[in-house]
């Protein structure tokens, strides 16, 4: 009798085991990544939790995860995703019915070892008139591309705050963006979240409905691009903090396992990691990324650049020889009420030129040539420093030089100081123009000063960027 019971038990156990294995196999997601009808090997496929490679025939199998909304690919160098106007179609929604998800790639007709990308942030459309401002910006982008960028591989990175708490404008933003026919890779911003939902996990679902996963990656040449969500909704009115959750950090670690150490890495996220070289642990939680140190640790060993927005002003921080942050000023300027930001930076966008694993960059002001890299103020323009000439050099970093000449005589380097941009101060004090009472000028550290020996002399300011490009501007006296 005992033997019979034992055999029955073992038989049942085998049946259960087979059923579990069958369910596991059935729950796997599989598919094919192909180009021109042929499978593409070694393409990274992810469900947001796991990362796998396609085999020699372009096939993949990845575990089903109950919290995964998408299966998506990291577009490999030399290829492009299928595109619906400006929207790259590198992902598919897991619908719960199908287990097979195939992807089609397009062979890039251009050599993407050399490529260019533009960085925009804080478009922040909240009403119809804002769309008109965004269209004007896109016209500037289109003109710049036609004149300066001809046959290079090109795309745009949007660092978030596409709308201003108005998800209903996502479709209008997309429609406007489609005019320039360039792929745009979007990053979620705090004003792109859904507020009033019960938890962080629900705050980004509307964004995903329009633009796909909130974290993902793609390649061009010897550069790896990563988009992250660091807006952590804490469900108290409109409260959020700058924070990258553990799920995203774990995915990032897995994603980077497939990236050679000699490749450039760019990370796009909305909220800055830090506005200072040394992390300030008393910084306001919505203004910086509270666990930025964890991100830095994961990026060690790579030459990495962080691309952020959120602040509505422009600055660069060099953390060390292999890590730098570029915080890009707002496309919307002073919330579409003026074409400069509250630090005096003109509305604009970043232009990054990648060659192999090297990169150069510049800031492009809307309505100006790319040589417009600073603004000068004569004696008397600043009520803070009425005796000084002042230069606002918005894309400055520690490797730039700002020098001045008086009547052709070299006078030396100008002194950097923290203060208010005179024009921004005037604009922000005009409450009828800016409408919002809370708009104020902010102090910036990319201002430079000098006191002329003769205030009526011909003054010229010469700025040299970190790449050796020289920009000159004469100071016009106030009459």
Stretch-by-stretch model annotation:
Residues 43-47, 70-71, 402-404:
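Hydrophobic beta-strand segments
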Residues 256-281:
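Short acidic, glycine-rich surface-loop motifs adjacent to enzyme active sites
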Residues 49-63:
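Short, acidic Ser/Thr/Gly-rich low-complexity loop/linker segments typical of extracellular
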Residues 24-29, 35-36, 75-170, 455-460:
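N-terminal active-site segment of His-dependent metallophosphoesterases
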Residues 323-396, 400-407, 445-474:
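Binuclear metal-dependent phosphoesterase catalytic core
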Residues 421-449:
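Aromatic sugar-binding surface patches on proteins
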Residues 77-82, 88-93, 167-261, 282-307, ...:
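Extended active-site neighborhood of metal-dependent phosphoesterases/phosphodiesterases
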Residues 25-26, 32, 36-37, 43-53:
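Short amphipathic beta-strand segments in non-cytosolic proteins
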């Amino acid at each position: 009798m005992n033997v019979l019971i034992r055999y029955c038990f073992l038989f049942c156990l085998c049946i259960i085991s087979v059923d579990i294995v069958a369910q596991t196999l059935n729950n796997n997601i599989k598919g094919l990544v192909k180009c021109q009808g042929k499978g593409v090997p070694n393409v990274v496929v992810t469900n947001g939790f796991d990362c796998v490679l396609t085999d020699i025939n372009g096939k993949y199998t990845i575990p089903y995860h109950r919290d995964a909304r998408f299966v998506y690919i990291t577009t490999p160098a030399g290829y492009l995703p299928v595109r619906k106007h400006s929207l790259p179609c590198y992902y598919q929604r897991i619908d719960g019915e199908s287990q097979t998800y195939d992807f089609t790639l397009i062979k890039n007709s251009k050599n993407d070892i050399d490529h260019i990308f533009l960085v925009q942030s804080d478009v922040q459309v909240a009403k119809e008139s804002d769309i008109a401002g965004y269209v004007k910006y896109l016209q500037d982008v289109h003109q710049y591309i036609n004149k300066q960028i001809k046959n290079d591989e090109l795309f745009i990175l949007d660092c978030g705050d596409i709308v201003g708490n108005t998800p209903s404008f996502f479709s209008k933003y997309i429609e406007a963006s489609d005019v320039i026919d360039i792929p745009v890779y979007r990053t979620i911003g705090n004003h792109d979240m859904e507020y009033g939902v019960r938890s962080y996990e629900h705050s980004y679902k509307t964004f995903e409905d329009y633009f796909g996963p909130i974290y993902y990656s793609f390649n061009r040449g010897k550069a790896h691009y990563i988009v992250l969500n660091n807006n952590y909704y804490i469900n108290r009115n409109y409260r959020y903090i700058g924070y990258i959750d553990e799920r995203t950090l774990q995915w990032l670690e897995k994603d980077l396992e497939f990236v050679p150490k000699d490749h450039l890495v760019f990370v796009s996220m909305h909220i800055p990691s830090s506005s200072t070289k040394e992390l300030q642990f008393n910084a306001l939680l919505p203004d910086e990324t509270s666990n930025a140190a964890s991100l830095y640790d994961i990026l060690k060993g790579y030459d990495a650049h962080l691309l952020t927005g959120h602040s509505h002003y422009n600055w660069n921080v060099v953390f060390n020889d292999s890590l730098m942050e570029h915080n890009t000023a707002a496309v919307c300027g002073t919330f579409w009420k003026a074409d400069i930001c509250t630090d005096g930076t003109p509305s604009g966008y970043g232009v990054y030129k990648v060659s192999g694993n090297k990169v150069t960059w510049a800031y492009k002001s809307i309505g100006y040539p790319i040589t417009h890299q600073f603004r000068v103020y004569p004696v008397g323009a600043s009520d803070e420093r009425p005796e000084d000439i002042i230069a606002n050099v918005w894309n400055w970093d520690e490797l730039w030089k700002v020098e001045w000449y008086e009547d052709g005589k070299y006078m030396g380097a100008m002194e950097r100081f923290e203060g208010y941009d005179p024009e921004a101060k005037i604009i922000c004090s005009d409450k009828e123009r800016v409408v919002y009472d809370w708009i104020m000028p902010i102090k910036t550290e990319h201002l430079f000063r000098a006191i002329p020996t003769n205030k009526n002399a011909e003054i010229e300011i010469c700025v040299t960027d970190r790449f050796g490009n020289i920009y000159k501007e004469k100071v016009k006296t106030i009459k």
